[in-house]
C-alpha cells in the first residue's frame, strides 16, 4: 500500500454473522430503541466521531511536516545563510504555521464544542487536505532531500493521502454538507 505501512490492513468477510441493534430498547435512557427510527442518526453520530479522529490524523501529518520543515530550514545553509533567514522561506513557513494552528483550533473545537451537523465533515475535509499540502510543502522546503526515502517528509506525504479517503472521501463529505444545508 502507498502509506500507513505501520498499520495492518486486511480484508474481512463476514459469513452468517449476526447483527445487533445500535441501541436496544431503553438503553439510551430515552425509552427509544428497536424501531425508534434513530438507527441511521446513531450511525452518523459514530461516523462523525470517527471523522474527527481522521481530522486529528491529518492535523498530525501537517504538524509533523511543519516541525520537519522548521528544523531543516534552520539547519540547511544556502546562498550564505540558513534557509530560515531567506524572505521567501520565512513567508512559506509563516503560512504553514498559520494553516496548522488554524486547523488545530478547528479540530479541538470539533471535539470540545457543540456537535454541529456540519462540523465534523468540514473539519475532516479541511484537516485531511492540509495534511497533504503541508507534507508537499515540506518536500519542497527540503528540496531534493525531501524526495529521498531516508527523510521523513516523503513518508508523511504517503501517510497523509489516506486521510482524505477514510470515513468519507471529499465528494461524500461535500454531499453531506450540501444535504445538511438544504435541510436547514
Predicted regions located by residue number:
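Internal glycine-rich alpha/beta core junctions
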Residues: 1-184
